[in-house]
């Protein structure tokens, strides 16, 4: 039996390999989350079983009808690649306890219970076809297993439930599905500690099966990255990934005709992507496929447009090793991302003149992307004044034009005061 490491020793070993394991993820910046399961059939949020007080037997009858069309995962992966995403994360099992693979540990699954196919297997194959990294979402909370609530107070139930979870993780990560890049835990209830879940033992086993895997922070251990949900807030001193719903209402499928007005357009997606780039994070944007597995129509055009924009500007302003942005709100019509001494201004609102306040570092050049056309500018101690090119030369994909600003060194910005009376001549008084 493998010796279980102490928490400090385990975390030390994980930290030693983190940079190598996470290099691709830090460069990727943008991924697709997919929430899919028996809840999809009801179309009233992925928490429908709990929110509506469904009895287990009645919900099992719903799950028995879950038979998406073979090939649906290929639609998801194709769209993710078209959108400029670099990885995908699928809910292999959500809180309802229903597994999307042919599990021998959990017969309540898409094959044995519903007579369908191994969705996880097809998902992995689809990701590989389109050059995407593979992530598995795995809910610790379970509304179906009889020990999933008893485990909080009954040691024997806890041992059985831990064995149940561990058995499923071995099925998913033990080699049948090949190399898996991300394990995305969720909702560690009802137990409130890593000791209760046996997370040290569980995650040590996971890393033994998949040495290069990266793991999120939702098993009561910090692991590799933090996961702000429905907000774009950086985790200080840590890698982080903001997971966001597409319609700001539900992770699971909702009626498209009604969800459409609440959903993001391409500008909204790119605005989120800029925020995570500016703060050094990743964006995991969700779709909730329809009952047959097809992509909800309100997601298609915005994601495809986002992908066309990223094809033009992504290599400069999004992908790869960006640096924490030293530029804060130097303009009211756009925001920034940064790579060393090069700052990328994302212009969200077109204007006949651009003025950037507070830069102390000398600006060498401004170029219009993607072609790199030089743009004239003037710089004094308070401002950089730019005359943008005509509208027909600016971005025609999503109306978000990107300018590359190259400085002599990493730019230093003295933020403009909110009180103009503090400005004395050419001197900005703090």
What residue ranges belong to the model's regions?
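Mature catalytic domains of secreted/periplasmic carbohydrate-active enzymes
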Residues: 1-430
